[in-house]
């Protein structure tokens, strides 16, 4: 009898433990998101952080945004000679580490998630661990992107490998769970010696990007035919190839080109467009709030970028019902989104891109069909809701195996 009672007691205890574990797995988390620029949707990393924050809150979690421009936990900007000037042209700022703000923001948090490996992020992880709070990190800054912004330095042998090593040394070696937005960048981390637990989770797209109404079968190709591209106006985004391709198109006079973004090459790209393009064009910054309507008004999305960890702009375009035409590059993950070969062209090849553009202009029924296919595929595979649920699962795993050891 005693043995039976003891056995029943153990089973009861295990049942209670299982119930407690289940309750913990369903309970809302308090997550501190540490991103240098927390109040700016002009660059991809900040945009991703703000989208995740909104969806985390919608799913019932408590989010504390910590960074420049945060309404609740703001920090000062850190000025780095020359580097800050270049970064500002790409809507980026560096945050000043602030232990007092960190401690206030992290008090009572379940986990801290850091976006970038600079001094600000390193200080946040150090503070979290001192407070006994687990920290995770995202790998959102591709070393190849840094090198393209550094001019001739990108031609130095081994420069990219050095940056992968440096980022690991500065931050990621103190992290057990890393969020990578694509399999491509996860493979790069493995190739460069990262041994942490890698979680491949898309940045997702916001639900306000909804599909446009596709044209009825038999409708002629629209005039003007509006082509849109979105991204930093920097050399690695290679908008120059897009401008040359539009100039080579058989339908150049009927094309209206919109390149949405800001960056160091804005003046140069505008000068090139003025010289080469017979049709209308616009190159410059567009407020993020305007992008859903703008994308739905366009006919084709071109993404000529050579370097991308994922490319949120392609996701948003596909979700809006646009067919993408994407550069194939070993340093870009964006090609993973292509559902047909006619959505790909060889990077830096304006002739091939012009051929792709002409084919889609001359096949309006296929353009409408594939636009609807891309929109539905994106809704099923890359919704912010499903991506954030995977992110929360990663955070719960990090919390469960945290032992306080750096």
Residue ranges and their predicted role:
Residues 106, 285-286, 293-298:
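Short alpha-helical donor nucleotide-sugar binding micro-motif in glycosyltransferases
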Residues 117, 306:
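Aromatic "clamp/platform" in nucleotide-sugar-dependent glycosyltransferases that forms part
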Residues 130, 142, 158-177, 192:
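Membrane-proximal helix-turn-helix segments that form the acceptor-binding/catalytic region
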Residues 211, 218-247, 258:
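Conserved donor-binding/catalytic core segment of Leloir-type glycosyltransferases
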Residues 267-289:
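Nucleotide-activated donor-binding/catalytic signature segment of Leloir-type glycosyltransferases, i.e.
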Residues 323-327:
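Short hydrophobic beta-strand element within catalytic cores of glycosyltransferases
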Residues 339-351, 359-364:
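Conserved acidic donor-binding segment of nucleotide-sugar-dependent glycosyltransferases
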């Amino acid at each position: 009898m005693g043995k039976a009672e003891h056995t029943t007691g153990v089973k009861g205890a295990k049942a209670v433990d299982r119930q407690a574990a289940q309750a913990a797995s369903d309970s809302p988390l308090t997550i501190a998101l540490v991103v240098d620029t927390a109040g700016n949707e002009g660059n991809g990393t900040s945009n991703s952080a703000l989208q995740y924050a909104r969806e985390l809150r919608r799913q019932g979690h408590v989010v504390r945004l910590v960074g420049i421009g945060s309404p609740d936990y703001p920090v000062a900007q850190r000025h780095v000679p020359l580097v800050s000037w270049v970064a500002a042209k790409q809507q980026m700022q560096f945050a000043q580490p602030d232990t007092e703000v960190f401690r206030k923001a992290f008090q009572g948090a379940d986990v801290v998630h850091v976006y970038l490996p600079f001094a600000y992020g390193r200080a946040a992880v150090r503070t979290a661990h001192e407070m006994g709070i687990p920290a995770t990190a995202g790998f959102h800054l591709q070393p190849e992107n840094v090198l393209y912004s550094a001019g001739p330095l990108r031609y130095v042998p081994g420069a990219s490998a050095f940056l992968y090593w440096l980022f690991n040394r500065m931050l990621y070696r103190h992290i057990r769970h890393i969020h990578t937005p694509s399999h491509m960048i996860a493979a790069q981390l493995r190739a460069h010696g990262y041994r942490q637990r890698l979680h491949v989770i898309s940045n997702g797209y916001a639900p306000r990007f909804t599909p446009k109404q596709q044209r009825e079968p038999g409708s002629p190709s629209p005039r003007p035919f509006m082509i849109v591209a979105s991204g930093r106006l920097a050399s690695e985004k290679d908008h120059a190839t897009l401008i040359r391709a539009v100039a080579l198109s058989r339908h150049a006079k009927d094309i209206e080109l919109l390149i949405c973004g800001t960056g160091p090459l804005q003046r140069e790209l505008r000068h090139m467009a003025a010289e080469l393009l017979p049709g209308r064009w616009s190159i410059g910054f567009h407020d993020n709030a305007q992008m859903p309507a703008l994308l739905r008004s366009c006919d084709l999305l071109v993404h000529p970028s050579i370097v991308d960890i994922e490319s949120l702009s392609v996701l948003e375009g596909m979700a809006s019902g646009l067919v993408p035409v994407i550069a194939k590059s070993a340093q870009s993950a964006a090609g993973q989104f292509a559902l047909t070969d006619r959505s790909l062209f060889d990077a830096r090849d304006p002739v091939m891109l012009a051929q792709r553009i002409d084919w889609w202009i001359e096949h309006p029924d296929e353009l409408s069909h594939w636009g609807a296919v891309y929109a539905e595929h994106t809704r099923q595979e890359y919704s912010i809701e499903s991506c954030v649920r995977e992110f929360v699962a990663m955070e719960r795993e990090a919390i469960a195996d945290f032992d306080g050891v750096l």
